Design a protein with these regions (language model features):
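Alpha/beta catalytic cores of nucleotide-metabolism and tRNA/nucleoside-modifying enzymes
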Residues: 218-224, 235-241, 245-293
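Active-site beta->alpha loop and helix N-cap motifs at the rims of alpha/beta catalytic domains
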Residues: 71, 84-150
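Glycine-rich phosphate-binding active-site loops on the catalytic face of alpha/beta enzymes
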Residues: 69-74, 144-146, 151-153, 196-204, ...
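Catalytic cores of alpha/beta
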Residues: 52-57, 178-187, 234-250
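N-terminal amphipathic alpha-helix/helix-capping segment at the start of soluble metabolic enzymes
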Residues: 19-39, 104-109
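Glycine-rich, proline-tolerant flexible connector loops at the mouths of alpha/beta enzymes
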Residues: 47-49, 67-96, 198-205, 260-261
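Alpha-helix-loop-beta-strand connector modules within alpha/beta enzyme cores
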Residues: 82-116, 162-171, 175, 213-226, ...
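Active-site-adjacent beta->alpha loops and helix N-cap segments on the catalytic face
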Residues: 21-25, 29, 75-83, 95-102, ...
């Protein structure tokens, strides 16, 4: 009986280690079809809590392969002005970390397929407690976490183990300025995909050298089998297509989020902003898909 139990536990372990996360499955499917991922970023609760879940569903209809949700935080050091303001609006509307996670749970009621990644900072997670935070995320159907201020080290390795127990991915940022040793640790610890920051600076920075980005992406690809997605500075179909030539996916945030800047509580303006966001999604999707047609 003892042997049987051991055999069962070993089989269960093998089964668990074989399970692909939703993020991994999505990239696998895209690769089989010769397609690249379009990953929009929106801030949870921006411009108000009522908008987020409905917008997530609309983003999927308009070509999102995965959705990145920002967790509002009062001191967002890596975020440019556009995303920082979105966070302020969300906090003004009382969107807490737990409420943001609840939005994902609501989205999951009718969408079991599209991966959702949360991007945020350590502090709000530490207030809840790492284990409880990951448990809440897992129950809600979150697939990956990107904590901007959690560097790849012993702490992140421990956190990585917690995430693996819940079949979730830990996403890390790599930048043009990342030192070799740190890059090595990121490629060892990261899973799901690598988020390559295309610019030296903060989100929404302006000058994007697509040829330089492609060169860096190709270099990273010689060191890892993980998909590489590029974010920061992608504003239109042309830049998305140029980036998707070498990368496995493009992440677009500021270019979408900026449409909520001046809407306030005006329902008509919010509707108009959403239409502009979805129109931009169509442009990006079409441009990226031209690569595989």
């Amino acid at each position: 009986n003892y042997d049987k139990l051991n055999h069962f536990l070993f089989q269960a372990f093998l089964f668990k280690s074989r399970i692909m996360t939703r993020i991994e499955r999505t990239f696998d499917t895209l690769k089989q079809h010769g397609k690249k991922a379009l990953i929009p970023y929106i801030m949870a609760g921006d411009p108000n809590p009522e908008v987020t879940v409905d917008l997530m569903h609309k983003l999927v209809v308009h070509g999102a392969d995965m959705i990145e949700i920002g967790l509002p935080f009062s001191d967002p050091m890596a975020d440019g002005k556009t995303i920082a303001l979105a966070g302020e609006r969300a906090l003004m509307g009382s969107t807490s970390t737990k409420k943001a996670i609840e939005m994902v749970a609501k989205f999951r009621q009718t969408n079991q397929k599209t991966p959702v990644l949360l991007m945020g900072y350590l502090n709000p997670m530490e207030i809840i407690g790492a284990d409880e935070f990951v448990q809440l995320c897992s129950q809600a159907g979150v697939d990956g976490l990107l904590l901007v201020d959690l560097p790849p080290n012993e702490t992140s390795a421990h956190f990585n183990q917690i995430l693996k127990n819940y079949a979730m991915n830990q996403i890390f940022l790599l930048a043009p300025t990342t030192e070799e040793e740190r890059q090595k640790t990121v490629l060892e610890q990261g899973s799901g995909f690598i988020y390559y920051v295309s610019l030296k600076g903060v989100t929404g920075s302006k000058a994007l050298d697509t040829a330089d980005v492609s060169k860096h992406v190709e270099q990273i690809k010689t060191k890892t089998d993980l998909p590489i997605c590029v974010g920061f500075g992608i504003r239109d179909g042309a830049s998305a297509k140029a980036i998707a030539g070498s990368a496995d996916g493009v992440i677009v945030g500021s270019e979408l989020v900026r449409h909520f800047e001046k809407v306030g509580d005006d329902a008509d303006k919010i509707t108009q902003a959403i239409e502009q966001i979805l129109s931009k999604m169509d442009e990006l999707r079409q441009a990226i898909d031209e690569l595989s047609s």
